[in-house]
Amino acid sequence: MTMHTIWHSMAWPLLKILGSLSLSLLVANLIEALNWTRLLSRFSRPLIRAGHMQDVVGASFSMAFFSGLAANTMLSEAHQQGRLTDRELVLANLFNSLPTYFLHLPTMIFVTVPFLGTAAAIYVGMTLGAAMLRSLGIVLAGRVILPPIPEGCVECQLPEKGPTWREALHKSWRRFKKRIAKICLITAPIYAAMVALNSWGFFTAAEKFIADHLSFMDWLSPKAASIVMFGMVAEFTAGLAAAGALLHGGELPVKEVVLALMLGNLLSTPMRAFRHQFPYYAGIFRPALAAKLIVYNQVLRAASLLVVALGYYFLG
């Protein structure tokens, strides 16, 4: 690899990730130091009460509408301080599916509409429904698995009056310095490994292997199956381009196009999620825990997409 390639494919993206992680860590520490978690948790209070979840989970849920990194950092800090158990951390991370989805919703709308036209509303609506299903499912799981929070104690662990800005900044900076070195030491080599595997064609080969062994897609027409293939071996927009061409040419009905896109989304995302999310997840959580969270998220995501797609297949 030349220096130019190393800079553009590894060094510069890694610097951006570490910069985002650093900013998110500072923001999360500052919010907690100022006791703003009390305010943020109020927006999701009915849901976290129903799910027997702690106040910091509600604060993280609200924060995830603006920054997924800051939301996860908030959960990691609470877990390290013993305020969240392993089980609560996993449920809290999965609970943030809906706000995390909303972070990407504008981009999804602006990308899908030019290709799919009115069919984009069905596709986006189905993926939104799947995200809502995931968060509501976690609320139900929390209600069954977690012990009830005493009435009136969603915010009771936080003091009424927070520290001054000077005190909060000092506390945030002190905690930031303790964690940032560890984050860099973990994130940098993992990101470098992901770039190396990608440059060696590992992920492309894995996606091609999956695409070549999709015998269960016999129920799809060859044209619809091509949408799935393009979405897997290339990028999401390649699948959209194929779908748009077939849709506007009258080659496929809307329903089959949408189902093909859903299937391509379901099959291609796990590998890409691991490739893109693991480096910064491992910087926020322990690497083993980071891998576990990504697996849980992808399993839940696949299950919710499958439920929504089956509902559309039989009822749409």
Briefly describe each language-model feature range.
Residues 1-19, 42-47, 141-181, 208-218:
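Hydrophobic transmembrane alpha-helices of multi-pass solute/ion transporters
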Residues 1-37, 100-123, 217-238:
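Long, highly hydrophobic alpha-helical transmembrane signal-anchor segments
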Residues 18, 22, 31, 66-69, ...:
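Residue-level signal for the membrane-embedded core of alpha-helical transmembrane segments
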Residues 28-32, 76, 113, 142, ...:
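Membrane-water interface at transmembrane helix exits
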Residues 32-44, 173, 177-251:
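Transmembrane helical segments that form the transport core of multi-pass membrane transport proteins
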Residues 47-56:
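Membrane-cytosol interface motif
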